[in-house]
Amino acid sequence: MGQKVHPTGIRLGIVKKHTSTWYAGKAEYADKLNQDLQVRKYIQNALAHASVSRIDIERPANTARVTIHTARPGIVIGKKGEDVEKLRTELTKQMGVPVHINIEEIRKPDLDAALAAQSVAQQLERRVMFRRAMKRTVQNAMRQGAEGVKVQVGGRLGGAEIARSEWYREGRVPLHTLRADIDYATAEASTTYGIIGVKVWIFKGEIIGGIEEVEANQKKKGSK
């Protein structure tokens, strides 16, 4: 059987950027990496209902900058910014340096693989039929302008005795094309029969200019 490489990992430095940006010597590298994992875990748990897709961490000179990409910025910020201030205080305590939090709104949540995977998982937990959940997610993404979408679920589907995996795809998802902008994410649905895994691939088109084009587009978004 053909083994599949992680679609994001193989594209790092080509059309994908790292989610952690900092430099550390040998002595503190492991500590900082572990700290990043703990911070991400804490934010995901604290903002479980805020549709958080991605968390970027930067560490410029004795400070830290955390960017939270979410479809519901109002929930993250809270009344008069109370919730985001609480979060900043807690992260400062965890990281041991002053933390600045940026919140980026996701304009099209249907085109975000992480949010799409979370959506399928939530539907499965509400006992929606898995085929209907997959089809709905794929069609929503295609309607928003995706060039191709694939959703796969695996586990005791429909309460079956034997676990299996099923998938549904529309459009094309070229995993071997390195310049293809493929958003990939996974999620888990906790059902009465056990855990059901969800994988989502969303193909948004090809990036001809490489990582430079990605960075230029991000700067344009930031200046708006």
From Swiss-Prot:
Q: Which InterPro entries match?
A: KH_dom, KH_dom-like_a/b, KH_dom_type_2, KH_sf_prok-type, Ribosomal_S3_C_sf, Ribosomal_uS3_bac-typ, Ribosomal_uS3_C, Ribosomal_uS3_CS
Recorded hits in CDD domains, A to Z, give: KH-II_30S_S3 (cd02412)
Q: Which GO terms describe its biological process?
A: translation
State the source organism's domain of life. Answer: Bacteria
**Limits of the KH type-2 domain:** 39-107
Matching PANTHER family = 30S/40S RIBOSOMAL PROTEIN S3, SMALL RIBOSOMAL SUBUNIT PROTEIN US3C
Assembly and interaction partners: Part of the 30S ribosomal subunit. Forms a tight complex with proteins S10 and S14.
* Protein name as it appears in the record: Small ribosomal subunit protein uS3
Q: Which organism is it from?
A: Saccharophagus degradans (strain 2-40 / ATCC 43961 / DSM 17024)
